[in-house]
């Protein structure tokens, strides 16, 4: 049995194949996922699993160079926005490398989804609970 934090074999496989600047998205339950992108559906019911648990687990395995958020999250979901930015600051310290935060409109966010290696759907049901993770390098 795998000893690491991340046990999901599909997500582990995607992370293992990522190259520098490749992207994966962690999505809320409502984000439209293009059929051309690998969809890893973790959603069991509303709120399970929640967005932050999935983000924290994935970033235990993945080096993150940058993230993309919909600008709307700042005003429409400020509690989650604050939790995400606090966590990213902690992750920067753990990785000993900065993480750039890129803001786009929600419509722009959706247009870049076909370029992702995978979209991981959570059970999160709060607005704009979506993040693109850009793969970094560990050296």
Curated annotation (Swiss-Prot):
GO terms for biological process: D-ribose catabolic process. It is found in: Cytoplasm. GO terms for cellular component: cytosol. It catalyses: beta-D-ribopyranose = beta-D-ribofuranose. Its main location: cytoplasm. The active site is at residue 20. Substrate binds at residues 28, 106, 128-130. It holds the Pfam family RbsD_FucU. Pathway: Carbohydrate metabolism; D-ribose degradation; D-ribose 5-phosphate from beta-D-ribopyranose: step 1/2. Its EC number is 5.4.99.62. Keywords: Carbohydrate metabolism, Cytoplasm, Isomerase. It comes from the Bacteria. One of its GO terms (molecular function) is D-ribose pyranase activity. Catalyzes the interconversion of beta-pyran and beta-furan forms of D-ribose. Belongs to the RbsD / FucU family. RbsD subfamily. Homodecamer. This is D-ribose pyranase.
């Amino acid at each position: 049995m795998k000893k690491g934090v991340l046990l999901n074999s599909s997500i582990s496989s995607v992370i293992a194949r990522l190259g520098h600047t490749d992207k994966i998205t962690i999505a809320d339950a409502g984000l439209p996922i293009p059929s051309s992108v690998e969809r890893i559906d973790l959603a069991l019911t509303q709120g399970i699993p929640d967005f932050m648990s999935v983000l924290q687990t994935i970033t235990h395995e993945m080096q993150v160079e940058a993230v993309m958020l919909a600008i709307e999250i700042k005003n429409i979901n400020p509690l989650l926005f604050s939790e995400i930015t606090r966590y990213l600051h902690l992750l920067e310290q753990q990785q000993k490398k900065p993480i750039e935060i890129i803001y786009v409109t929600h419509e722009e966010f959706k247009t870049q989804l076909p370029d992702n290696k995978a979209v991981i759907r959570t059970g999160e049901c709060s607005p704009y609970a979506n993040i693109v993770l850009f793969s970094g390098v560990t050296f």
